């Protein structure tokens, strides 16, 4: 899977991932959008990520 992995509004960059999904999430403590490989369960009051299963789907 190819996922975007840039922070916030930086120019898009990608990485090739072992996982079959990508995620995008806004972290509550700094309001920065993070992107990357896989999908995860948030801790505490952090909102859940947007997860998707196609190449470059997490822009």
From Swiss-Prot:
InterPro entries reported in the protein's UniProt record: Snake_3FTx, Snake_toxin-like_sf
GO cellular component: extracellular region
Entry comment describing in which tissues the protein is expressed: Expressed by the venom gland.
Transmembrane domains' residue ranges: none
Motif mapping: Cell attachment site: 43-45
Keyword vocabulary terms for this entry: Cell adhesion impairing toxin, Disulfide bond, Hemostasis impairing toxin, Platelet aggregation inhibiting toxin, Secreted, Toxin
GO MF, one example: toxin activity
Record note on what altering residue 43 to K does: This mutation alters integrin binding selectivity
Highest taxon in the source lineage: Eukaryota
Subcellular location: Secreted
Disulfide bonds: 3-22, 17-37, 39-51, 52-57
Known function: Inhibits ADP-induced platelet aggregation and inhibits the binding of purified platelet fibrinogen receptor alpha-IIb/beta-3 (ITGA2B/ITGB3) to immobilized fibrinogen. Has also been described to inhibit cell adhesion to fibrinogen, fibronectin, laminin and collagen.
Family recorded in the similarity comment: Belongs to the three-finger toxin family. Short-chain subfamily. Antiplatelet toxin sub-subfamily.
Protein name: Dendroaspin
Organism: Dendroaspis jamesoni kaimosae (Eastern Jameson's mamba)
């Amino acid at each position: 899977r190819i996922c975007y992995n840039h922070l916030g509004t930086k120019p898009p960059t990608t990485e090739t991932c072992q996982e079959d999904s990508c995620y995008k999430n806004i972290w509550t403590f700094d309001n920065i959008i993070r992107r990357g490989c896989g999908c995860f369960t948030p801790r505490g009051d952090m909102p859940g990520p947007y997860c998707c299963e196609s190449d470059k789907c997490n822009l």
